[in-house]
């Protein structure tokens, strides 16, 4: 994207979250035995990596040129937060990819032990992001 304001940071974070959430949900399905989704999870990990890189690039551009804050609809302080959230979401995407690989290669045997933990982690991620998006930091 040549226009820095074409995708504001908040919108980019929401898009990244949708990708990561779908990846994580699919990785749980893979642990439950739906192996066909494994390649899709890996493909979406590449999308998540690119979007996280894009958010970092936007943030760095904003630090170099403070007038971009208005176009990106975020202050420098908010930019730091969005950058950190993007990094965390990308890391969750990496974990979803790993879960998908484990489920695909090993099948249900290890998945039985991992499944409740994976579902708990999914719930925590969803609640934290809901609080972040709704600007309720105490709940996040």
Task: Give the role of each language-model region.
Residues 1-140:
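Cytosolic, long alpha-helical scaffolding segments
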């Amino acid at each position: 994207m040549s226009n820095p304001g074409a995708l504001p940071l908040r919108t980019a974070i929401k898009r990244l979250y949708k990708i990561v959430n779908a990846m994580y949900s699919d990785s749980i399905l893979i642990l439950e035995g739906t192996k066909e989704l494994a390649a899709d999870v890996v493909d979406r990990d590449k999308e998540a990596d690119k979007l996280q890189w894009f958010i970092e690039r936007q943030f760095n551009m904003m630090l170099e040129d403070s007038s971009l804050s208005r176009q990106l609809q975020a202050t420098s302080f908010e930019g730091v937060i969005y950058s950190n959230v993007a990094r965390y979401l990308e890391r969750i995407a990496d974990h979803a990819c790993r879960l998908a690989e484990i489920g695909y290669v090993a099948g249900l045997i290890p998945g039985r032990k991992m499944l409740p933990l994976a579902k708990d982690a999914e719930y925590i991620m969803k609640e934290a992001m809901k609080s972040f998006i709704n600007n309720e930091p105490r709940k996040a």
